[in-house]
From Swiss-Prot:
Chief localization: nucleus
Annotated positions of the Phosphoserine modification: S8, S44
S-S pairs: none
Zn finger intervals (C2H2-type): 82-104, 110-132, 138-160, 166-188, 194-216, 222-244, 250-272
PROSITE patterns per record: ZINC_FINGER_C2H2_1, ZINC_FINGER_C2H2_2
Gene Ontology cellular component terms for the protein in this record: nucleus
Gene Ontology terms, MF aspect: DNA-binding transcription factor activity; RNA polymerase II cis-regulatory region sequence-specific DNA binding; zinc ion binding
Compositionally biased tracts (Basic and acidic residues): 1-38
Residues joined by cross-link Glycyl lysine isopeptide (Lys-Gly) (interchain with G-Cter in SUMO2): K80
Protein's name according to its UniProt entry: Zinc finger protein 691
Keyword list, A-Z: DNA-binding, Isopeptide bond, Metal-binding, Nucleus, Phosphoprotein, Repeat, Transcription, Transcription regulation, Ubl conjugation, Zinc, Zinc-finger
Region spans: Disordered: 1-75
Length: 282
């Protein structure tokens, strides 16, 4: 019958702009047609009525269920309501829009911890960092371990000797090089600008913050091709790969035992110092 609830679907289409009041949403009608992607034409400009090839299909939608109407129309219209104000390109979510806008702003927030090169996308930074895993020009004369930087080789050689003579008087942490101590010391003096919004912990550089933030997100972008195990940071990923190759480059000069990680060697060498202290006291 002709009740007031039985109205044509066109009377209940949501008006443009009703999807939210976010500042990056722009009325599609204000975007020049030449700058829209295919499928972005206004509904008001779409051909009315059925096409000659397709039969007319009646769809009954209740006025009390507008969400059902929205779900019904979604497959018919490729909605991309987020528009770049610089070039007019459209996107279906704010994340893709923000990533695109870095092309215009030149922003590159993702920095390589090895060489300092910056990238606009996290995925590009991760792909770049894998290159450094293959670049190891500095070889230790005491073992088969090679390093990407001369500073890393120098620090490694201190591990062979079991020495970390440079100690921070504020927290007690020790380092094999004075330059490493100087870098560390600045973390006590300078404010840490990178603050985690999840737990409030602060960091002095974006690389350390990125590694920490993955503990909250669960992101583990480094995957071992041998066993499929994943890691959140590149250093643990590299150490894990040595287990597949059987590499144990860290050698104890006191007993000749080898280790795959420098931290394990340092822990082991403390047992020798404890034995020596016991003999001297007896």
């Amino acid at each position: 019958m002709g009740s007031e609830k039985e109205q044509s679907p066109e009377q209940h289409l949501p008006e443009e702009g009703e999807r939210g009041n976010k500042p990056w949403r722009v009325d599609d009608s204000k975007v020049p047609d030449g700058e829209k992607e295919p499928g972005q034409a206004n509904l008001s400009e779409a051909p009315q009525g059925p096409s000659p090839e397709e039969p007319t299909q009646e769809v009954a939608v209740s006025a009390a269920e507008p969400e059902d109407l929205s779900a019904h129309r979604r497959p018919e219209v490729d909605e991309k309501p987020f528009v770049c104000v610089q070039c007019g390109k459209t996107f279906n979510n704010t994340s893709n829009l923000r990533t695109h806008q870095r092309i215009h702003t030149g922003e590159k927030p993702y920095q390589c911890s090895e060489c300092g090169k910056s990238f606009s996308r996290s995925s590009n930074r991760i792909r770049h960092e894998r290159i450094h895993l293959e670049e190891k020009h500095y070889k230790c004369p005491n073992c088969e371990q090679s390093f990407r930087r001369h500073a890393d080789l120098t620090t490694h050689q201190q591990d062979h000797l079991g020495r970390r003579p440079f100690r921070c008087d504020l927290c007690g942490k020790s380092f094999g090089q004075s330059s490493a101590l100087a870098v560390h010391y600045r973390t006590h003096l300078e404010p840490a600008p990178y603050i985690c919004c999840e737990c409030g912990k602060s960091f002095s550089n974006s690389s350390s913050f990125g590694v920490h933030h993955r503990t909250h997100t669960g992101e583990r972008p480094y995957e071992c091709t041998e066993c499929g195990r994943t890691f959140s940071d590149i250093s643990n990923f590299g150490a894990h790969q040595r287990t597949h190759r059987g590499e144990k480059p860290y050698r104890c000069t006191a007993c000749g035992k080898h280790f795959s990680r420098s931290s394990n060697l340092i822990r082991h060498q403390k047992t020798h110092r404890g034995e020596q202290a016991g003999r001297e006291s007896s």
